[in-house]
Amino acid sequence: MSTAERAPILLTPGPLTTSYRTRRAMMVDWGSWDSDFNELTASVCQRLLKIVGGEGSHTCVPLQGSGTFAVEAAIGTLVPRDGKVLVLINGAYGKRLAKICEVLQRPFSTLETEENVPTTAADVERLLAADPAISHVALIHCETSTGILNPLEAIAKVVERHGKRLIVDAMSSFGAIGIDARKVPFDALIAASGKCLEGVPGMGFVFARSAALEASAGNCHSLAMDLQDQHAYMRKTGQWRFTPPTHVVAALHEALSQYEEEGGLPARQRRYASNCETLLGEMARLGFRSFLPAEIQAPIIVTFHAPRDPRYRFADFYQRVREKGFILYPGKLTQVETFRVGCIGHVDAAEMRQAVAAIGEALRELEVLEI
């Protein structure tokens, strides 16, 4: 992939580097009520449902805004006001789930583990057995603050066995790590346009179990975030209730075409895994230590311990690497200083090697010697 047309390269978990074709798709203006745009939206939703294997059981409801908008909409719509959510936390985005429940005044309890410790099915089993008031369990599949992968399928089986409902934030995994609605029972799985599908940010979407969505009328705290009302209106008219992000939808439609051309989820996962493996190997040669062990590291974003050298300052390091054509991500841990490097986006292993070379050059220029 040529870098000439797209510098700097974003090695972040989203927004991320997109292809020229995806950006070009935004050069066309669309009427938000026009039949062509309605068909575009319908096509996007059908293709998304196919990725998750949700045809016949789930409904794809798109929503304007960031992924967090869609997460809040899912909780607000699908959790009744007298429900109770068990929130599983091992990072910043799990904490955000709890904050959403607090703001929406949905009763909740939490299970928080260390940032490098995945939640286990045994943890969930114990807590559900102890508290029959819990109606829903909410978790992050891939916690973006570290890159840790939580055991979704095992947790989903426990939740189902207890007769509870599962809400999955799959923002950083959907499209690159397999999730099959026929094997993983969930009431809602939430993702967004600007992550592993390599679209641009601005649209979230919720795969809602159709029966649960139909039963949720009147639950939502908000007009704009009411997924049941959004779906009912779209089913009746083919249109969004309120002004849609037309260019974002068009870009996602094109990004999905490229996703399919590449070979779908297996091919996307292979490329990201190659990116991650290359990144880890090259960074280890520079002396960097990754925060997570390999067995729980998702090929989405890697957290590295910051250099121990007292001359290291992230802001200076970031700027030097940026000048060389690569944008990194600050750390988001509470206990140790780190920084993050994304493996996703329209990039390949060759560009990961170029990025690590730029990191090495930046450290030498800054005279950061102790890694």
From Swiss-Prot:
GO terms for molecular function: 2-aminoethylphosphonate-pyruvate transaminase activity. It catalyses: (2-aminoethyl)phosphonate + pyruvate = phosphonoacetaldehyde + L-alanine. Keywords: Aminotransferase, Pyridoxal phosphate, Pyruvate, Transferase. Optimum pH is 8.5-9. Pfam families: Aminotran_5. The modification N6-(pyridoxal phosphate)lysine is found at residue 195. It is an enzyme of class 2 (transferase). Optimum temperature is 50 degrees Celsius. Activity increases from 30 to 50 degrees Celsius, the enzyme is inactive at 70 degrees Celsius. Inhibited by phosphonic acids and very slightly inhibited by aminophosphonic acids. GO terms for biological process: organic phosphonate catabolic process. Its EC number is 2.6.1.37. 1 pyridoxal phosphate per subunit. Involved in phosphonate degradation. NCBIfam families: PhnW-AepZ, PRK13479.1, transamin_PhnW. This is 2-aminoethylphosphonate--pyruvate transaminase. It comes from Pseudomonas aeruginosa (strain ATCC 15692 / DSM 22644 / CIP 104116 / JCM 14847 / LMG 12228 / 1C / PRS 101 / PAO1).
